[in-house]
Every structure is written in C-alpha cells, then in structure tokens.
C-alpha cells in the first residue's frame, strides 16, 4: 500500500485534511490567532501533500495502464511513459519529506549596525537598509522601522526593522526562508565621499536576523518578574526630541541580559507591546539556536546565518562586484543588487542549504 512506502506522507495528508476541517469551523474562523497558526501549518504541509498526491496518481495510472497493456498497444506505451516518470515524482516526494526549518514561514526582525569604518560604515549600513527595503517591496512584503539611530551625513549607526509577508505564505515563500541567510558581516570596498585622494577604503556593517515571534506565541513564556522596563523620551537624529512625552521603552530580560529599545510607535503602550514581541523573537531565536547546537541537526545553516562574526559578503564598488563567500557566488551587478535585485544571491544560499539537507538525509 502507498502509505506503507511513505507513512510520513500519509500522516501529513491526514493532518492536512484535519486542519482544513478545523479552519472551516466557526470557532476557528472567529479566532485570528488560532486561524493564523493553523494556516501556517497548513501551508507547511502543502508541499508534502502535493507531492504525495502526484505520486499516488502516477502509481494508480501506472497500475491501470499495466493491467491493460496486454490488450492495447496504446496502454503499453502509456505504461512505459509512466514507468519513466515515476522515479522523478518519487524523488520530489522524498525531497518534500525532508524536514524544513520550522520557522521558514515566519516574519523576520533584522538589525543593521555600522561596524569598522566610521562615517563610511554608517553610510554603507544605510545602503543595506535601502537594499533590503527595496528587496522586500519586490517580494510584496512590508518593512516597519522599529528603531533607528542616524548620523549627520545621513548614515545609519544602527537600525531595527520588521519585515512581514501578507497573509500566511507557504514556508518556501516566508520572509525567514530567505532573510535568514543575511545574518553576518557585510564588507564594502569603495572610495568614500570624504576621500580626497581617491583611495579605496574597506569598512563593514553587521546584520543580525531572527524569526519574529507571534504575539501569542506559547513556545516562549516570559515571567513579568524577569523584566526591567525603563521609560525615556524618544529621540531623532543627533539626539533631537521627536515628541514631548516619555513614550520610548527600554526592556531588559534579566536572566539573559537581552535589551530591546523601542521608540517609533505612537504611545508608550504600543512601544511596550512592540518591545515585548521583539524580545520574544530574540528568545525564540536563542532557543532554536541552542536546540540546533545540541542536536547537531540539519538546521546548521540557520545557526550559521545567525553568526554575527562571520564575513558573508563583499560589496566592491570600483568593480561593481558582489561576492557571497559561503557559496562563492559572484556577479558584476552590484548597482542592481543594492537597488533590491537580491534574489539571485539569496538563491545561491538556498540551493547550498538544500544540497546540505539532502546530503544529510542520505
């Protein structure tokens, strides 16, 4: 029987059908949080179910064609075609059954920090912010700036953004599925605008990414007693006050020392809620990173993407060249990449990760 050969796929189909029934119930329809969680799991199972149904169809058609092959030459020809098609369909199903990163469908919190290089590093951090914003626009995602410290020349000392998809995307289309590869040190080589002798300078910016926790995420629980909350006045570029109320929030998680600053919402209550969500996201990322390290499983590429010290990419302006050091991807369209044409670079990381996961399954 089919489910004896691929029991995991048969189980996925049963769960998929059960979720569809739940999502149609009035109780779930009236509960957005429950509906979102079920929708995410439904999308996660979709690739497996689609591949499984395709495999079942080919198997059934092949059996029927073989049964009639002795009586009709057309059926014999059809049976031969289906025999040739079956291995490819089966391989697609085996690939779909390889566990994905469970966070792929989640949205993403990203921090960009200017590194070595002074004002030039801050200007480059601003370039990265623009690049990711343009890329998100091309993908139909929204970008919300949660906190930002800028320089007098328009550079970015540090910025935190939330990148979010619309609705409930399939895991492969989720924000985290693509943006998790962006964590690390990004190096730039170019002639600074302040360089009078035309010398190329190397500077860097660090990017930190982690999947965004849901507001009601029960995977992470925070005891209010573990929080220290400071309230202060929001500030803009150069320390200028952007409002006259103390609405900015600094939230510190005492057990881990993680600190989150939030000032871009309109009220203290909104900044508290936003800070708590970012804190939960950080703790969720830490939890998953620890689990991956302990289990030494297929999520190693995600852990690598969270490594803040790894130089992952070089942006060479004089040669209009971009290099991803993890995959050896190289192209001479840096201007287009910085304008948001980033997909080919990210695809090289996705393909390398998929190859690793396939190798680890064998």
UniProtKB/Swiss-Prot annotation:
Coiled coil: none annotated. The modification N5-methylglutamine is found at residue 240. Keywords: Cytoplasm, Methylation, Protein biosynthesis. It comes from the Bacteria. It is found in: Cytoplasm. GO terms for molecular function: translation release factor activity, codon specific. SMART domains: PCRF. GO terms for cellular component: cytoplasm. Its main location: cytoplasm. Methylated by PrmC. Methylation increases the termination efficiency of RF1. InterPro entries: PCRF, Pep_chain_release_fac_I, Pep_chain_release_fac_I_sf, Prokaryotic/Mito_RF, RF-1. Pfam families: PCRF, RF-1. Belongs to the prokaryotic/mitochondrial release factor family. NCBIfam families: prfA (TIGR00019), PRK00591.1 (NF001859). Peptide chain release factor 1 directs the termination of translation in response to the peptide chain termination codons UAG and UAA. This is Peptide chain release factor 1. It comes from Bifidobacterium longum (strain NCC 2705). The lineage of its organism: Bacteria, Bacillati, Actinomycetota, Actinomycetes, Bifidobacteriales. The gene is prfA.
């Amino acid at each position: 029987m089919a489910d004896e050969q691929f029991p995991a796929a048969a189980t996925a189909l049963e769960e998929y059908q059960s979720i569809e029934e739940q999502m149609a119930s009035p109780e779930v329809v009236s509960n957005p949080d429950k509906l979102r969680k079920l929708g995410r799991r439904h999308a996660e199972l979709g690739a497996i179910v689609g591949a499984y149904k395709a495999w079942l169809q080919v198997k059934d058609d092949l059996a029927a064609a073989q049964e009639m092959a002795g009586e009709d030459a057309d059926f014999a020809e059809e049976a031969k075609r289906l025999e040739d098609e079956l291995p490819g369909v089966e391989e697609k199903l085996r690939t779909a059954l390889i566990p994905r990163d469970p966070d792929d469908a989640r949205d993403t919190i990203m921090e960009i920090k200017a590194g070595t290089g002074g004002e030039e590093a801050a200007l480059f951090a601003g370039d990265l912010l623009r690049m990711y914003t343009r890329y998100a626009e091309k993908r139909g995602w929204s970008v919300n700036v949660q906190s930002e410290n800028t320089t007098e020349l328009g550079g970015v000392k540090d910025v935190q953004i939330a990148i979010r998809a619309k609705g409930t995307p399939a895991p492969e289309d989720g924000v985290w599925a693509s943006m998790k590869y962006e964590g690390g040190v990004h190096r730039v080589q170019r002639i600074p605008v302040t360089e009078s002798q035309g010398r190329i300078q190397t500077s860097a910016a660090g990017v930190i990414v982690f999947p965004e926790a849901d507001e009601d995420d029960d995977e992470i629980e925070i005891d209010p007693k573990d929080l220290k909350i400071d309230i202060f006045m929001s500030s803009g570029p150069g320390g200028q006050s952007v409002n006259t109320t103390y609405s900015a929030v600094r939230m510190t998680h005492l057990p881990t020392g993680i600190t989150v600053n939030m000032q871009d919402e309109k009220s203290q209550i909104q900044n508290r809620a936003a800070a708590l969500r970012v804190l939960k996201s950080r703790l969720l990322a830490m939890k998953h990173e620890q689990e991956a390290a302990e289990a030494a499983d297929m999520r190693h590429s995600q852990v690598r993407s969270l490594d803040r010290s790894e130089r992952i990419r070089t942006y060479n302006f004089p040669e209009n060249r971009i290099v991803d050091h993890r995959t050896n991807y190289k192209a001479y369209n840096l201007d287009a990449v910085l304008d948001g044409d980033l997909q080919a670079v990210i695809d090289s990381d996705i393909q390398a990760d998929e190859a690793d996961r396939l190798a680890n399954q064998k």
